């Protein structure tokens, strides 16, 4: 079942997809979005960034103890042309280094 999160259909679809994945894994998934149907940035670029952030949050949550798992998302317009994305999730506390880079 598709839940409706915002007026922008493309962004709504991305969030709905990750909401369904979180539900399938019984991870609490909370969303607060205040965006118009048309945004001031390229939708494709925005959705690529959003998908990457949500994928990382889901992967990190799956690696933590069940009682700590959660994903909280806030997306809103700030000023006239800025969009702020805030994603909070639990993680196992291990910061991984790859080729000397975190």
Language model regions located:
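Conserved short strand/loop->alpha-helix "switch" segment adjacent to the catalytic nucleotide/phosphoryl-transfer site
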Residues: 3, 30-49
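Glycine-rich/acidic phosphate-handling loop/turn and adjacent ATP-lid/helix
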Residues: 82-102
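Short flexible loop/turn segments at helix-to-beta-strand junctions
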Residues: 1-5, 40, 66-68
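Short beta-to-alpha transition helix within the HATPase_c
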Residues: 7-23
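Short beta-strand/loop element within the Bergerat-fold HATPase_c
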Residues: 68-81
């Amino acid at each position: 079942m598709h839940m409706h999160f915002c007026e922008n259909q493309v962004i709504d679809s991305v969030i709905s997809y990750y909401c369904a994945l979180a539900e399938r894994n019984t991870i609490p998934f909370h969303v607060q979005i205040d965006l118009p149907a048309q945004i001031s940035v390229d939708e494709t670029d925005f959705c690529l960034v959003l998908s990457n952030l949500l994928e990382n949050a889901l992967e990190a949550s799956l690696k933590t103890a069940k009682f700590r798992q959660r994903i909280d998302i806030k997306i809103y317009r700030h000023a006239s042309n800025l969009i702020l994305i805030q994603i909070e999730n639990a993680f196992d506390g291990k910061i991984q280094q790859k080729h000397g880079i975190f």
